[in-house]
Amino acid sequence: MQEEEGNLEELVYFYPPSTTPPAVGKYTQLISDLLQSVSIVDALPGGAAQAGVLCQDTKEVLERENTVLEIAIPRQDNLVIVGDIHGQFADMLSNVLSIQLNLNNSKATDGRGSPSTEIYKFLFLGDYVDRGPQSLEVITLLFALKVEYPEHIFLLRGNHEEAQTSRLYGFFQECKSKLEGTGDRGPASVDITSSTWLQYNTVFCWLPLAAVVACPSGMFFCTHGGLSPHTLSVPLLKSLRRHEYGMVDDFEDTFYTPTSRGGDDMLEGPGAKARLVIDGLLWSDPEDQLSGCQMNNRGCGFIFGPDVTRSFLDRNYSYGFPPSKRQLIGEMKPGMQFILRGHQCAREGYMWCHGGLVLTLFSAPNYCGMHGNKGAVALLRGQVQAGKDRVELEFNVYDTVVTGGSDNLVACLSPFAFAHYFSGDS
């Protein structure tokens, strides 16, 4: 492992290096700086060029992961599940990542009086960028953590990790204003094919689309949005060519757009059903008073009823978790118990629907500086699950640490995108 140059005593590590060392040591300084709220311009002194190297390293890590992650949480492990962040960097630091950072600073001991080796793994459900003022800080820190701790930090894709969306709702403009023309890049470029924004979006295409989490008390399915009429089984999801969805052409300002945005011919053409499945995973919403699926009024994805959820969970009741990972868990209760997703602002930070079969988690408190909602994360403690018949989650609910109102949103959105906020995607 090659550590970065500098005074190691001044570094803030996300995990204790004695028990969970960084995988490559290339981004320890960057992580330390961002954990201490150093300006992104100072944290990335190489500017756009340095960000591009981080994007390439992250892409190489993600390419080795499956489209559907399989995350085992045995008795000795803990998992923090995180909903939408939307550029609210201060809240992510203070309310989400602080769960592990505070543990690092505690004097906790194990049952024998030795320093505790307890750590938290993290599963993020997507929507890291857009809306909030510090999307670049959020995604840069998460990418660096992913490279250094690939078996502890898991990142799923949200509907805002897609070029057409992030072009409109703030991330594109933020990349240009904060990094273009900095460091070794020289003057800012107007060509989107060479922009920092494009490099981040290339990585977005490789983010996994879903995860199955297994622990002693059972399994549950995680994704950003939800289901579609074609989302039948987890094994089929594994064959999706996720990197082809939402790509930006390398040489032209064109987008491979989601296919469910209207039109009678939306099921025609090769791969159309696969794209509809991905539309659902990223864009769909549950609805209690509905049977089956309907087109979503967001303009993409679907609204799905409790019967669709029950059918999906029943079809995947006997999902075959990999033997090597199941062995880590030991005795495990059977069954796919519920769906955990983000994508919708929840007044109390989380909400159950479909008779307790769908859980929505939202981790951006006072969303856009105007909604007044709580934020929440879910905690899965492996030790607690032992001997239980069903998965039991704990919830950390919190208020924003940011003072002020909607200026936090307007600061990073163009007038065109801001107008879209009130009329389109929510």
Where do the PLM segments sit?
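Feature recognizes metal-dependent phosphohydrolase scaffolds
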Residues: 1-426
